[in-house]
A protein has these predicted regions:
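Short, glycine/charged-rich beta-strand-loop motifs at protein surfaces that mediate ligand recognition
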Residues: 300-301, 332-334
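BRCT (BRCA1 C-terminal) phosphopeptide-binding modules in DNA damage response/checkpoint, repair
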Residues: 52-62
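Elongated, non-catalytic scaffold/linker segments and compositionally distinctive motifs
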Residues: 35, 61-66
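Catalytic alpha-helical scaffold of carbohydrate-active enzymes acting on polysaccharides/glycoconjugates
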Residues: 1-38, 44-53, 69-72, 77-230, ...
Length: 483
């Protein structure tokens, strides 16, 4: 065996952090496990911090992740696996908005990690080629997720009216306790993508409580004539108890910015529930911020216009960077009162011919199909040949080959695709990483942290709060005192 008989890709992964495997899967760079396919590729990635060596075969080149670690000021692998959240702020012109989101910007960390790995790989004679995140010829994908917490007939109707003509780009996540008994609302949602937002609008700390709430919400929507697909946790919160509940119920996908935001989809905890991160800034937090920062002299109308301008800019920035554009908002008191925010945001997205406007359910199906594709890349006489398998029937896949500062984007048409390694066609400059909006740290409020630790809320009826756990007992006792 010599190095020319082995494919340039897939990468062969030895004992490496889970976050590297996840990042490569998100990126679409093919890889195999060394324990399963030891001769699967020319380059072996290993971590001497966790193993005794590369155990490379003749003709293989080993790349040690320890060399990457030495250039970092923090452990990117650990940060990518972190599941805690923190209060984070952003500035929209003069208005400072804040939300509780994932502690780390996982997109920025993943991009830094993979840029460093790409450099090491190319210096060793390898290439960087990936399966595109979107079907060919799309550059990005767009969805507006509407979270239906409470029900206001006027705001509900105004929101759906504003979305007319753009239904294929809308996903509705519905709280069943407030909507399942509203036949006029159910009737308008039929034919749309509907997901569950729970029965009660609360994300619990215990797996059994989350499972019961999600199951009840799904069953209530089904009884009303809807077939929900997917889940979005109230307040965007994530914890392992929620993931356990979602896994036990076989939920297809979920979306919580408390775990990740503005990032490519991934599977938390090596499970089966696909996480679809969204952009965390919405109309609601803009209105709240304007009311709190009275010294700015901004009314609700001005705050709504700032939010619209932000949505339009984030569409431009994310489209340029080739990122998913997944926005969200609420009808009651927000999009329903300022429907032009939704209407003009949707119109902006519709102006891009290479932007795939789709539901989160359809995007989740695409992402799963993308993850099943296999790629091998061979080099001969200056030509690269990509051999593929298990490509989806519903969509054309895209190959993205990195050549210096440029990227060539080619359709994956057929099981074999060949092109020049030095001068590929359909080549364009690689976009710079997106920097807008720039976050800043916000001090944690001890009272809010304590409430979350105790799982404090007033949504669940007192008689339905279980006292089998200490949190449930404490919450029920405090509710009896306060109520």
């Amino acid at each position: 065996m010599n190095d020319q008989s082995l494919p340039l890709l897939p990468l062969v992964l030895g004992r490496v952090p889970k976050s590297l495997r996840r990042s490569l899967a998100q990126e679409g760079v093919p890889f195999v496990d060394q324990a399963v396919t030891p001769a699967g590729g020319r380059f072996v990635i290993f971590d001497s911090a966790a193993s005794t060596g590369a155990h490379a075969l003749p003709g293989q080149t080993a790349i040690d992740l320890l060399a990457l670690r030495r250039t970092w000021t923090c452990d990117l692998f650990a940060a990518l696996e972190d599941e805690t959240d923190v209060r984070r702020g952003w500035r929209l012109d003069s208005l400072a908005v804040s939300e509780t989101v994932a502690r780390h910007d996982k997109r920025a960390l993943r991009e830094r990690l993979l840029a460093d790995l790409r450099k090491r790989l190319e210096n060793a004679g390898g290439i960087w080629l990936r399966l595109g995140a979107f079907p060919f010829p799309y550059r990005s994908a767009f969805n507006f997720r509407i979270d239906h917490d409470d029900y206001d007939p006027g705001d509900f109707a105004a929101t759906l009216d504003a979305a007319k003509g753009h239904e294929r780009a809308i996903s509705h996540y519905v709280c069943a306790s407030t909507h399942a008994e509203r036949p006029e609302a159910i009737a308008r949602l039929k034919g749309s993508h509907v997901g569950s937002h729970g029965y009660w609008h609360h994300t619990y700390r215990e797996a059994a409580e989350n499972a019961a709430n999600i199951r009840r919400g799904v069953e209530a929507l089904q009884a009303a004539g809807l077939e929900p697909s997917g889940f979005a946790a109230p307040h965007g919160r994530f914890n392992r108890s929620l993931l356990e509940a979602l896994e036990s119920l076989g939920v297809d996908h979920s979306s919580e910015f408390g775990l990740a935001y503005d990032e490519l989809p991934f599977f938390p905890g090596d499970g089966r529930v696909l996480q679809l991160p969204v952009h965390p800034i919405c109309l609601g937090i803009c209105l709240e911020a304007a009311r709190e920062q009275q010294d700015l002299g901004l009314g609700d109308d001005e705050a709504a216009d700032l939010c619209l301008a932000h949505f339009q800019r984030i569409i431009v920035e994310k489209h340029r960077a080739g990122e998913p554009i997944f926005l969200y908002g609420h009808p009651e008191g927000r999009l329903g009162r300022y429907p032009h925010v939704l209407r003009e945001t949707l119109a902006t997205a519709a102006g891009y011919r290479d932007l795939w406007r789709t539901t989160l359910a359809r995007f989740a199906a695409w992402w799963r199909a993308r993850g099943r594709v296999t790629l091998e890349v061979f080099e001969y006489a200056g030509q690269l040949t990509v051999r593929s398998g298990r490509t989806p029937q519903e969509h054309r896949c895209a190959l993205e080959y990195f050549c210096g500062p440029d990227v060539a984007r080619l359709p994956l048409d057929g099981p074999l695709v060949s092109f020049s390694a030095a001068a590929p066609i359909l080549r364009s400059p690689l976009p710079a990483p997106r920097a807008y909006p720039t976050p800043f740290d916000q001090a944690d409020d001890f009272r809010i942290s304590l409430r979350r630790y105790l799982d404090w809320e007033r949504v669940t009826p007192l008689e339905e709060i279980s006292a089998r756990t200490w949190r449930g007992w404490a919450k029920r006792t405090l509710r009896r005192i306060k109520d």
